[in-house]
Amino acid sequence: MLEFVFFGFFFLSILIFIMAYWPKKPMTRAPQPSAVSDLSRPRNAVRAVQGNSTARRALVIGNGAYTSVERLKNPANDASAVAGALTRLGFDVVEKHDLGVLQMQRALRDFEDKAEGAEWALVYYAGHGLEQNGRNWLIPVDAALTRATDLPDEAIPVERVLDRLSGGRKLRMVILDACRTNPFLARMVMNGAATRAVTHGLAAIDPTHGEVVFYAARDGSVAADGPGSNSPFATALVKHMEEEGVELGRFFRKVTSRVLKTTKNKQEPFVYGRIPDEDFYFKPPK
């Protein structure tokens, strides 16, 4: 009896040993997505980059409600007309009206982020502007400007506007309907300020490659606010922006020709800068 138990226990031990160490067939798992593949092709990120790289973005500012000089009646209408046209043409538009100096600084800082990586970054400004010693300034509605030395504290230099567009990939454009007669000049004279270097209109500018600045009137001359609800310059801009298939260089020529005709050759818009060697359209041909 003891022998039977012993041999039974012996064979059971051998069986357990064989089962424990017999080679097992490896388990198969369903194929998993490659982590490297997922990281190299993030669908949402690619979409975002493509969308940003082809975007056309614009900041539109109309300053008319000046607090220390007579108000301008047309900049609000001009800004709304241009913003509307750009929106219809597919631009992502930010429209601002009657900004003080801090508000203008903030609007430009915010737009710098928005313009980053955009194919076409554009700023349109309607309102007062002036030139001092060859440097151009845009005038916020809360500016007093009793002395020429007030400009750095109370106005926005045009080169700062261009700096805020530096993230645009292909074309960076500033359109200025700001060459109006300077009412601040008389205030400076009355206060005995040295005004020899402060003039009406804007000075010539030399943007870098890929930057274009379009003045409502050429350097040293002034632009009309216009007898209607919009300035002659804004009227021409909107008309020719929405013409299909007008390449950018031709657009500038058509706007200039229309303003000259409307003002009986008293106002000549002017373009400064170098357009990249590529065709640009506000409304591309079909």
Predicted regions and their residues:
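Cysteine endopeptidase catalytic domains of the caspase/legumain-like
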Residues: 1-286
